[in-house]
């Protein structure tokens, strides 16, 4: 009989990617430890028989307590750590509030570092895999999303370095380059771009309606279940041709979600090419009218 394999996933609130991945791994026979800041938001997982734990990735004490709790279940061997917890931030780059940027970085980047550091020994013992849920915006300069883009770009650079450094210990690192997915992240305070994100003294104020009208086409995004179904085989060693011969090998990057294929191609193109495409998508004027608000 095959030994139990344990998966720890952050950011598992219902309606999100983490929740769908938790259910997928559970259905495939893994022992899943699902976490979120509010346990009641994982009621569907609890009813499905999954173990749920309260975790705030921005809190060192919370991370430490969960590591100790998880150790009781895993006996010190964690096979997958999926860092999915994320925070959005939508606003013009030039108008960003440092406090908002700090909050996004604390979850999307520093939170991942905290988790990997805390669980390193459990992962090494199991020869496990770290999965950092990233986004194609780490390559693609999606307009009016600069803080989120920057947090994911930092995460990608960190992940690529971590992959090299942990290889001698038998721990693999994979980045899921996420395209458009229908999640509840857009409903969070900083996730939905509203007119409030463009103050009257902003240089974009005259174009606020145009900007809001041309945000991402959520209706075209894949569902969280479709995303989980696409990512899972590659995470467990069955989705790439070379995994037929080396099933233990995990890809450095997995691309899944709406426009992820275009993002993959775009990552190999000059930045100028993709920047031009994004400008056309958001319909920014080639020349903007500027009014100096510093002058009465």
UniProtKB/Swiss-Prot annotation:
Residues annotated as binding NADP(+): 9, 35, 41, 56, 84, 117, 148, 152, 181, 183
Molecular function (Gene Ontology), one example: triacylglycerol lipase activity
Keyword S-adenosyl-L-methionine: no
Any single GO CC term annotated in Swiss-Prot or TrEMBL for this entry: endoplasmic reticulum
Pfam families: adh_short
Gene3D superfamilies in UniProt: NAD(P)-binding Rossmann-like Domain
Subcellular location per the Swiss-Prot or TrEMBL entry: Lipid droplet; Cytoplasm; Vacuole; Endoplasmic reticulum
EC number: 1.1.1.101, 3.1.1.3
Annotated GO biological process: phosphatidic acid biosynthetic process; triglyceride catabolic process
Catalytic machinery residues: 148 (proton donor), 152 (lowers pka of active site tyr)
Residues spanned by motif GXSXG: 11-15
Reactions the enzyme catalyzes: 1-hexadecanoyl-sn-glycero-3-phosphate + NADP(+) = 1-hexadecanoylglycerone 3-phosphate + NADPH + H(+); a 1-acylglycerone 3-phosphate + NADPH + H(+) = a 1-acyl-sn-glycero-3-phosphate + NADP(+); a triacylglycerol + H2O = a diacylglycerol + a fatty acid + H(+)
Sorted UniProt keywords: Cytoplasm, Endoplasmic reticulum, Golgi apparatus, Hydrolase, Lipid degradation, Lipid droplet, Lipid metabolism, Membrane, Mitochondrion, Mitochondrion outer membrane, NADP, Oxidoreductase, Vacuole
Entry superkingdom: Eukaryota
Family the UniProt entry places it in: Belongs to the short-chain dehydrogenases/reductases (SDR) family.
Protein name listed in UniProt: NADPH-dependent 1-acyldihydroxyacetone phosphate reductase
Taxonomic path: Eukaryota, Fungi, Dikarya, Ascomycota, Taphrinomycotina
Gene name tied to this protein: ayr1
């Amino acid at each position: 009989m095959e030994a139990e394999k344990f998966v720890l996933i952050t950011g598992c609130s219902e309606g999100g990617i983490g929740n769908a991945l938790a259910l997928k791994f559970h259905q495939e026979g893994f022992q899943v430890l699902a976490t979120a800041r509010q346990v009641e938001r994982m009621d569907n997982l609890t009813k499905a028989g999954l173990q749920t734990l309260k975790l705030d990735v921005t809190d060192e004490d919370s991370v430490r307590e969960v590591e100790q709790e998880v150790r009781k279940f895993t006996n010190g061997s964690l096979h997958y750590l999926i860092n999915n917890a994320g925070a959005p931030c939508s606003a013009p780059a030039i108008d960003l509030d440092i406090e908002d940027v700090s909050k996004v970085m604390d979850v999307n980047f520093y939170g991942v570092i905290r988790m990997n550091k805390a669980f390193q020994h459990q992962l090494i013992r199991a020869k496990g895999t770290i999965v950092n849920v990233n986004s194609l915006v780490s390559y693609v300069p999606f307009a009016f999303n600069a803080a989120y883009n920057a947090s994911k770009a930092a995460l990608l650079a960190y992940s690529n370095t971590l992959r090299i450094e942990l290889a001698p210990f038998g721990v693999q690192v994979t980045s899921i380059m996420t395209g458009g997915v229908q999640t509840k992240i857009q409903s969070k305070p900083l996730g939905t771009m509203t007119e409030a994100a463009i103050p009257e003294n902003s240089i974009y104020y005259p174009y606020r309606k145009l900007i809001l009208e041309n945000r991402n086409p959520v209706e075209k995004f894949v569902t969280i279940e479709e995303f989980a179904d696409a990512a899972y085989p590659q995470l467990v060693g069955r989705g790439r041709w070379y995994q037929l011969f080396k099933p233990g090998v995990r890809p450095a990057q997995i691309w899944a979600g709406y426009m992820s294929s275009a993002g993959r191609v775009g990552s190999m193109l000059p930045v100028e090419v993709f920047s031009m495409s994004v400008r056309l998508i958001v319909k920014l004027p080639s020349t903007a009218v500027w009014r100096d608000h510093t002058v009465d």
